[in-house]
Every structure is written in structure tokens, then in C-alpha cells.
């Protein structure tokens, strides 16, 4: 991303560079995490005021780079940046033996924070209660439709690095393969989230030994 925002670039250098800059601007303009500051940045630059990308997003540079890479991976007709933005505000915590954690997981969204900071090797019991729709006709629980769509899935986030996604389903036990934050979502094509409806309430606790 540093190459894209470097000073001294000019329009018309190459279609690849133009496309990369367009993609970053589109992300910043439509992602709720960055949109307000991006608008201010644009106004300041057009009116000759002192401002820069580095000044505007110094504290969010790693987050933007992370979301930009995922945006490029998943972009397609129907992709919604606003639905796929990451929740950087929810604070994750480790669970004590007696603690319980629950969160709402929306079908019409990308990866969502659970608030769980997992310990490597620790087992957790989970249950996802509720129904959601992955299209106007198909309502399922967190186990999905039998062929993988609509299934509750998870991923570990650590240091802006993602693990491979894994299935959760409606109920079971998961062992953390690494230390990291647990993010979850309703499995559906990234370009098809707009017509999803409903939500599941996810309950988590440490498994008893």
C-alpha cells in the first residue's frame, strides 16, 4: 500500500497503478472505518490546505492495508465494502473458567468480532442460536443448507494475519490452533451478502476439563 500512496505519482503512469489507486480510494470512501476522514482529506487537498494520507491515517495504516488486501481478494460484482468492513472497536478478552461470552452475528455482514481472545490449545464450547437467510427463499440455522452455504464459520486474527477459515456450525467445540481473536460470519459468497437476512446469537465458554 505504501507504493500506492507515495508522493510524486501522476495520472497516466500505467493502468495497473491507476486501478490500484482507484481501488484504495473506493475502499476509503465507502468503508465506515475511514470514510469521514477520507472526505475531509479530499476537501483539504483540493483547497490547498496542509494535509496528507500519512497525516490522516497514520494510526490506521496497518488496518487499512489489511482491509485493502482483503478487498482485492474478494472484489466482484455485488461486493459491498460497507457490509464487509472490519470491527476494530470491539475489545477482545480471554475467558476465565466461569466466564460466558455472547454476541450477535449478522448474516448480512462479513467477518464480525466475537470479543474472544483465544489461548493457543484451549478448547471452547459454542452454540449459535437462531435462523438466517442467505437468499429470500432459503432460511437455515448455523449449520447451513447442507452444501456449505449459510454455515457459521470462524477465523483467527493475530497481528493482522488471518488463519484459514474453519467451520463452526450450530453447536460444538473448537480448539484454538493459535493465540488470536475469533471472528465469525455466515458463509456466503462475498458478492451475495446484500440479500441476506437474520442473525444468530453465538454463545462461547471455555470447555470444562
Predicted region positions:
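Acidic/His/Gly-enriched intrinsically disordered linker/tail segments
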Residues: 1-82
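Gly-Asp-aromatic-enriched flexible segments
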Residues: 77-209
Amino acid at each position: 500500500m505504501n507504493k500506492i500512496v507515495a508522493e510524486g505519482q501522476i495520472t497516466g503512469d500505467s493502468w495497473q497503478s491507476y486501478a490500484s489507486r482507484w481501488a484504495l480510494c473506493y475502499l476509503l470512501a465507502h468503508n465506515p472505518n475511514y470514510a469521514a476522514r477520507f472526505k475531509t482529506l479530499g476537501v483539504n487537498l483540493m483547497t490547498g490546505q496542509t494535509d496528507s494520507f500519512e497525516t490522516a491515517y497514520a494510526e490506521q495504516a496497518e488496518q487499512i492495508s489489511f482491509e485493502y488486501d482483503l478487498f482485492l481478494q474478494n472484489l466482484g460484482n455485488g461486493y459491498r465494502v460497507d457490509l464487509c468492513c472490519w470491527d476494530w472497536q470491539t475489545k477482545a478478552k480471554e475467558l476465565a473458567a466461569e466466564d460466558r461470552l455472547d454476541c450477535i452475528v449478522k448474516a448480512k455482514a462479513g467477518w464480525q468480532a466475537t470479543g474472544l481472545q483465544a489461548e493457543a490449545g484451549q478448547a471452547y464450547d459454542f452454540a449459535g442460536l437462531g435462523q438466517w437467510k442467505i437468499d429470500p427463499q432459503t432460511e437455515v440455522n448455523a449449520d447451513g443448507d447442507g452444501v456449505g452455504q449459510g454455515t457459521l464459520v470462524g477465523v483467527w486474527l493475530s497481528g493482522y494475519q488471518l488463519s484459514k477459515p474453519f467451520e463452526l456450525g450450530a453447536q460444538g467445540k473448537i480448539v484454538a490452533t493459535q493465540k488470536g481473536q475469533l471472528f465469525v460470519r455466515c458463509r456466503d459468497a462475498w458478492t451475495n451478502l446484500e440479500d441476506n437476512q437474520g442473525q444468530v446469537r453465538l454463545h462461547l465458554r471455555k470447555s470444562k476439563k
